Amino acid sequence: MTRSSDTPSSSRASLSYKDAGVDIDAGNALVERIKGVAKRTSRPEVMGGLGGFGALCQLPTGYREPVLVSGTDGVGTKLRLAMDLARHDTIGIDLVAMCVNDLVVAGAEPLFFLDYYATGKLDVDIAADVVTGIGEGCAQAGCALIGGETAEMPGMYAGSDYDLAGFCVGVVEKSEILDGSRVAEGDVLLGLASSGPHSNGYSLIRKIIERGQADLEQEIDGIPLRDALLAPTRIYVKSLLSLIKESDVTVHALSHITGGGLLENVPRVLPDTLAARIDAASWTRPAVFDWLQREGNVDEHEMHRVLNCGIGMVVVVPAAQAERAQAALEAAGETVHRLGEIVPRQDEEEQVRLENVR
């Protein structure tokens, strides 16, 4: 009888999952390494620790009509730059920031965060550095790291290259949701300074570096260019929640300045009948953006359409409360610029009038 090709044979070596490229022991070792990270971010509402099939979290007390707010995001190709420069310790902060800064725009308090880490070959040290950064981001935002997924997928990624995604859930009182409906003519726009490009525009940034063979050790405004480009995204959650919940300022809207810059993100929180008049001379653009524009010969409009240009969050408040809002935000550690005001929109004009551009 002829043996079929799929019949087991004692002459063949016994295969294991590790032979196929998946190291279960490495995954278990990572879980043990990061348990302390998760524990340090815990909130009273969290039930249980890492390792369960699902993570449990109660709603906080004190809400009459709690509304859950969710968000998911990644860090784009900033991740590629971080891997190329072997800087894995802060990219997790970026991941958290991109999610929680979106949640706080609705007025929501972030409750918990989960991450997804996918790689071709799990390097426990690299993964632990990344998750430690995620824990730091959660601590800055006041939310709990309650779970995640580590996927080792040989053949899907080159070597120890990895990809990241984050998922966050927050809560807001139904009557206090910020949705832009309160924005009115005469409101003032306050801009909160960014820490750098944050996590957007990195395909353009990497192209500029590649084309010019840039020396990433050169100093820009007193720090190496590599550090300026990889500065973690600023997390605005605590300062904004303090303004919303603990001050006498009525916040009308918030806008997280991500991909699309001021030109595309501010309109997302404006009624169709209103526009934002922003004075581009009201803040000094950080040196890293000037370097990018010069080295890439990037058009001014493109700069404001792709990069945050030094403004990471916009706060819209009544004109009579603008000074109090600015003082409160500065007391919370933010650098604040008075960008402009809300004006009537003329016909179908663009909703951001950027004046005094270079």
Swiss-Prot record:
Pathway listed: Purine metabolism; IMP biosynthesis via de novo pathway; 5-amino-1-(5-phospho-D-ribosyl)imidazole from N(2)-formyl-N(1)-(5-phospho-D-ribosyl)glycinamide: step 2/2
InterPro entries named among the record's database cross-references: PurM-like_C_dom, PurM-like_C_sf, PurM-like_N, PurM-like_N_sf, PurM_cligase
Family annotation (Pfam families): AIRS, AIRS_C
CDD domains on file: PurM
Gene Ontology cellular component terms for the protein in this record: cytosol
Keywords, comma-separated and alphabetical: ATP-binding, Cytoplasm, Ligase, Nucleotide-binding, Purine biosynthesis
Claim: Aminoacyl-tRNA synthetase is one of the keywords in the record: no
EC number(s) on file: 6.3.3.1
Name assigned to this protein: Phosphoribosylformylglycinamidine cyclo-ligase
Family annotation (NCBIfam families): purM
GTP-binding as UniProt keyword: no
Origin: domain of life: Bacteria
GO molecular function, one term: phosphoribosylformylglycinamidine cyclo-ligase activity
